[in-house]
């Protein structure tokens, strides 16, 4: 009897508390089941206590009312405009279980100007600030003031340059001082033991990845600035399930990345805020992704993995602003299409030809180059007699339309799993 009375008392007190705090009631009804009762993350949703300070009230209201689409967050149109301020107040009151939320400060810079914004991280002589201009500012102490720092040269893609040379024009390291190189800082990944990331640098910030995770670091100190992370995909098979991810591409204020389950996402490079999320292919059909995208003009271009699991490979191009697919080039033909005569037997139904390595681009020729992996199954070709176009090939595509210009096949009818997966390095010869 006492237990029943006590339980009833708790329910009454809780109901009374919610009645006095409509924001808490809204959070409990619509947010807590995914993001946890304290907003620090749950089984179905990420930690939002760290993300709320990075958005304005208007941005928060838009996210709540419209959702985040393919990212998995539904829209909540039933929350009225009159109720929204109470919910936003509750969101702004969320506390981290560990660490502290970003602190707002106004700083005097060495040139006498001021900078106001959120301090995302700091050391004794350094600050990483998300300014009110919504841009990242890296600062170093000069007496009682601060000076801005940035990178001497950016490396904004997997290969550094669109033509794939991976050549750096920096001259700070040379024959005379190379023997004196020593570690400057160390950053430890805690979420992955299969690192394949290429660090990308933009405006003094280094971006590194593991599966479904991007971390922004102060390139001068290695201090973490922000982290975007989403849960690994349960039930995924193939290379994407190993945790491999080769990095990001940056253009302007946007950062582009592939997820393990073959989604292309765009983030704000200053705050890590998700801008859009587009499904390239259905992971339930064994598609996955491990590569780094390539930016060409107003498009961001990438391929997928999954050939060893029987998928049909393709290269896709997506609008940088919206994530809308603009074109798709399939690496193997369907029955009856040109090239299908090089597939004799039932193997054309599960042809492989994955496109997981990053391509290159020749601006003078306005041509995109991409490489294609092995046919499937790898070692047995009895069900796929013929050359098996366009597997084990390099293809030249029109970057605006995806139309094939030409191809060269390195290994017709590959039964050795040779692939042709490498970055095409473009050179001018005499």
Please provide the spans of the model-predicted regions:
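Blade/loop signatures of beta-propeller domains
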Residues: 149-183, 331-338
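A detector of repeated loop/turn-to-beta-strand junctions in beta-rich toroidal repeat architectures
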Residues: 45, 261, 311-314, 389-391
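Conserved beta-propeller blade signature
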Residues: 205-209, 215, 255-257, 301-303, ...
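Short loop/turn segments that connect beta-strands within beta-propeller blades
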Residues: 218-221, 268-271, 320-322, 399-401
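Extracytoplasmic electron-transfer domains, predominantly the class I c-type cytochrome c fold
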Residues: 33, 38, 42-149, 155, ...
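Short coil/turn segments that connect the beta-strands within blades of beta-propeller domains
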Residues: 152-153, 203-205, 252-253, 297-299, ...
């Amino acid at each position: 009897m006492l237990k029943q009375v006590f339980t009833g008392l708790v329910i009454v007190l809780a109901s009374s508390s919610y009645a006095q705090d409509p924001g808490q009631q809204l959070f409990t009804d619509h947010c807590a089941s995914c993001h946890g009762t304290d907003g620090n993350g749950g089984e179905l949703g990420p930690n939002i206590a760290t993300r709320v300070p990075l958005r304005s009230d208007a941005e928060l209201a838009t996210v709540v009312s419209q959702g985040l689409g393919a990212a998995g967050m539904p829209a909540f149109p039933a929350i009225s405009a009159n109720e929204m301020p109470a919910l936003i107040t509750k969101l702004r009151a969320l506390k981290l279980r560990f660490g502290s939320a970003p602190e707002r400060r106004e700083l005097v810079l060495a040139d006498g100007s001021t900078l106001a914004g959120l301090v995302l991280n700091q050391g004794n002589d350094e600050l990483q600030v998300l300014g009110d201009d919504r841009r990242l500012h890296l600062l170093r102490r000069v007496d009682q003031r601060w000076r801005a720092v940035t990178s001497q040269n950016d490396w904004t893609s997997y290969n550094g340059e669109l033509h794939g040379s991976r050549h750096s024009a920096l001259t700070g390291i040379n024959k005379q001082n190379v023997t004196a190189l020593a570690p400057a800082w160390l950053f430890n990944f805690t979420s992955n033991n299969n690192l394949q990331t290429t660090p990308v640098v933009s405006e003094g910030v280094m971006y590194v990845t593991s599966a479904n995770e991007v971390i922004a670091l102060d390139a001068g100190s290695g201090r973490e600035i922000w982290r975007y992370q989403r849960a690994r995909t349960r039930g995924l098979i193939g290379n994407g399930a190993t945790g491999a991810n080769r990095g990001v591409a940056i253009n302007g204020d946007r950062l582009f990345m592939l997820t393990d389950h073959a989604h292309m996402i765009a983030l704000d490079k200053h705050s890590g805020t998700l801008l859009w999320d587009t499904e390239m292919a259905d992971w339930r059909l064994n598609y996955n992704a491990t590569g780094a995208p390539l930016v060409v003009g107003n498009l961001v271009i990438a391929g997928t993995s999954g050939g060893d699991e029987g998928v049909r490979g393709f290269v896709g191009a997506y609008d940088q602003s919206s994530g809308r697919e603009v074109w798709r080039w399939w690496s193997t033909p369907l029955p009856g299409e040109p090239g299908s005569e090089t597939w004799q037997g039932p193997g054309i139904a599960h042809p492989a030809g994955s496109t997981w390595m990053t391509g290159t681009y020749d601006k003078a020729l306005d041509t995109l180059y991409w490489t294609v992996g092995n046919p499937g199954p790898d070692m047995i070709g009895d069900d796929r007699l013929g050359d098996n176009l366009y597997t084990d090939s390099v293809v030249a595509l029109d970057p605006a339309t995806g139309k094939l210009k030409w191809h060269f096949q390195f290994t017709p009818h590959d039964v050795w799993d040779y692939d042709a997966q490498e970055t095409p390095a473009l050179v001018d010869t005499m």
